[in-house]
Amino acid sequence: ILIGLVGSEMCIRDRDRIFRKFGLSGKSFIPMLIGSGCGVPGVMASRTIENDRDRKMTIMTTTFVPCGAKLPIIAMIAGAFFGNSGWVATSCYFVGIAAIICSGIILKKTKMFAGDPAPFVMELPAYHWPTVSNILRSMWERGWSFIKKAGTIILLSTIILWFLMSFGWEGGSFGMVEELNESILSKIGTAIAWIFAPLGWTKAGEGWKMAVAAVTGLIAKENVVATFGMLYGFAEVAEDGAEIWGNLAAAMTPIAAYGFLVFNLLCAPCFAAMGAIKREMNNTKWFLFAIGYQCGLAYLVSLCIYQIGTLVTGGGFGIWTVVAFAIIIGFLYLLFRPYKESGSLNVKVKGMAKAR
């Protein structure tokens, strides 16, 4: 039934009034719905939006919806830190929806996206049941797409990760190393770990592993779990998974872990989805702006979660706590400041009244 509704676009008719309040078009609903399965077709579905501003904003926000590739990350964090609590997965979808709503409101107040959403006009076809052939073809396309992705991108990146974590310089010579901290991967992770220090990814000297996992997630989100599996030796633990959860729990606090989860949900998607964004934007500057906005938003939200969460749970008050409060104040200002168009309109109306 859902496939039939998506195919006929009947479900977006009642969403237009709601989406317009957030600066989006009702047609943005379909890309976001499809994006819950995979970001690539979700981004491509934005082609149905005629207005260029609305289309670009939809492209930038569609991947905030947790896709299927992000579900293993949600399951891993929920199992390791929150006792498989169901609220973790539920909250991830609410975080994604909140990011879309807030982004729509804030971006619509900028010069790049200013203006009312385009009027919703479309020809509604008759309701129809989805055919079996369409359902099977859709299942095959999505299944085959994942098989190709798993056999190429994920496999290749896993091999590269294995090489980087198995080789390094030890005793002045290059070769296989026994200590993971002497590997090439450790050196790379240590070099970039300081960037994520304000997010709390530094417990017990494990920050470089979190940094590496987050970066490999840009290749494919499934790589986050695969990276942890290689770094913590998931294949060598018991079937009940107790050692897995223990290893991860020793690497981060629960608050930092939830921030890590939110970062991976909101930051730039996988390479395939980024390629789709590049094609749909058809402009390098817009592509870089979209990726930069997604990564920047993910970083700031994760920072606020960790700093404020740590303060509330009895942690210390430091310079990054002040930064977090400043970010929240700035965010609230951008969210609730009046539209410039409304102000100029009021001035014109008052001027016309005085002239009369």
Residue ranges of model-derived segments:
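Extended, low-charge hydrophobic alpha-helical regions
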Residues: 9, 22, 43-55, 159-295
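Hydrophobic core segments of alpha-helical transmembrane domains in multi-pass membrane transport
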Residues: 78-80, 93-108, 154-166, 262-264, ...
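Single conserved hydrophobic/aromatic residue that forms the stacking wall/gate
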Residues: 1-7, 12
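Conserved phosphate-handling catalytic cores of large alpha/beta enzymes
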Residues: 41-118, 229
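Membrane-interface capping segments at transmembrane-helix boundaries
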Residues: 109-110, 334-350
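Juxtamembrane inter-helical linkers in multi-pass membrane proteins
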Residues: 13-40, 114-138, 181, 185, ...
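Long hydrophobic segments that form regular secondary structure
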Residues: 83-84, 113, 117, 127-176, ...
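Transmembrane helix-loop junctions at the membrane interface of multipass transporters and ion channels
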Residues: 64, 68-90, 275-283, 300-318
